[in-house]
Amino acid sequence: SDERSKAWPNIKASRQDIELSTRLNVESYLHTLKAIVPGMIKRRKGHVVLMGSLAGLYPQMSTVYGGQKGAIHRIAQSLRIELSGSRVKVSEICPGRTKTNFGKAAFTDKNKAKKFMSGFTLLEPRDIADAIMFALSVRWRSNISTIEISGTEQSPGGVPIIPDKDPILS
């Protein structure tokens, strides 16, 4: 079967999968921002950290997921402009493949999930936490806008350097 996944759907994605992943990957961010940003503006202090993805910055075989994460990238950029002068910072962390449950949740085919998350050293959740802490640690006059972080065996965009090792491409 050519069914790639639930969370990495291409044009064969079901309407239900697209709607569910859009609620998770875009709408939840917007609702959370609506809830927390006004208080930060009022206090004239705060730091919004959005979790993007390299899939949102670089074209990959993930039309829906990549598009949703691309929306997060644009939201982060636009929010930073909207909050200019408010003393509220906005940072976006864009990781590549990371050792999480994403592969299990994203793929309906367990073998593809395992293959997707193997063949090279993945980032650890701690690597992402360190990137977040770095963004939060800079002085008030500085803002880290975007951090791209991938494993050393991944090329820009998070796709493995050797394409035949990528289950999406092979």
What do the predicted segments below correspond to?
Residues 8-9, 13, 59-67, 78:
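Active-site loop-to-helix junction immediately N-terminal to the catalytic Tyr of the SDR YXXXK motif
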Residues 11-30, 45, 49, 72:
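Catalytic Tyr-X3-Lys loop
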Residues 32-36, 75-76:
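Hydrophobic positions on the long internal alpha-helix
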Residues 33, 68-69:
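Active-site helix of classical SDR
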Residues 53:
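Residue(s) in the substrate-gating loop at a strand-loop-helix junction
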